[in-house]
């Protein structure tokens, strides 16, 4: 019997991904800010110059857009029960300037007070907070979630006519 060489394994051959491929892999999952995308590329071993060039290229080609990212964050967080102060702070951590943040918050089509009331209804039931300790708890919850004072007062007042 002849000794035969083993057949080559049938498996995928993984080629090292280029910085652009890695960045696109991140962007197809969800939107990223320029700062966040650059940080993630650096964490994956991409050289700083190559990472910055990749982010610039993808921004120029429309794959990455801070305005689109900010609008998505506003939509997502507002739908999860967070207020404008929390969202503004979160967008600031992503390296967006105050003008971009203000523009993104302006795209929100809902009413912050109504969002606050919805959150209170989910936590305290349809009748809302009934006594002073519950109203304080509700106000504390809304403050932690980033709602402003006017929205907190309006949401914890809970007049049935509103």
UniProtKB/Swiss-Prot annotation:
InterPro entries: RecX_HTH_1st, RecX_HTH_2nd, RecX_HTH_3rd, Regulatory_RecX, WH-like_DNA-bd_sf
Signal peptide: none
Gene Ontology biological process terms from the UniProt entry: regulation of DNA repair
Disulfide bridges in this chain: none
A Gene Ontology term for the protein's cellular component: cytoplasm
Keywords for the protein's UniProt record, in alphabetical order: Cytoplasm
Main location: cytoplasm
Subcellular compartments: Cytoplasm
Family in the record: Belongs to the RecX family.
Function, in words: Modulates RecA activity.
Protein name from the UniProt record: Regulatory protein RecX
Organism: Xanthomonas euvesicatoria pv. vesicatoria (strain 85-10) (Xanthomonas campestris pv. vesicatoria)
């Amino acid at each position: 019997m002849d000794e035969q060489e083993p057949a080559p394994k049938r498996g995928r051959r993984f080629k090292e991904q280029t910085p652009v491929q890695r960045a696109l892999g991140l962007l197809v999952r969800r939107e990223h800010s320029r700062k966040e995308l650059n940080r993630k590329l650096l964490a994956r071993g991409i050289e700083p110059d190559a990472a910055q060039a990749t982010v610039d290229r993808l921004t120029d080609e429309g794959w990455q857009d801070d305005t689109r990212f900010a609008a998505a964050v506003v939509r997502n967080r507002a739908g999860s029960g967070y207020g404008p102060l929390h969202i503004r702070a979160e967008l600031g951590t992503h390296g967006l300037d105050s003008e971009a943040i203000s523009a993104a918050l302006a795209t929100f089509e809902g009413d912050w007070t109504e969002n606050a009331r919805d959150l209170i209804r989910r936590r305290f039931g349809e009748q809302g907070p009934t006594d002073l300790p519950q109203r304080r708890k509700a106000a504390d919850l809304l403050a932690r979630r980033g709602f402003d004072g006017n929205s907190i007062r309006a949401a914890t007042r809970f007049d049935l006519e509103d």
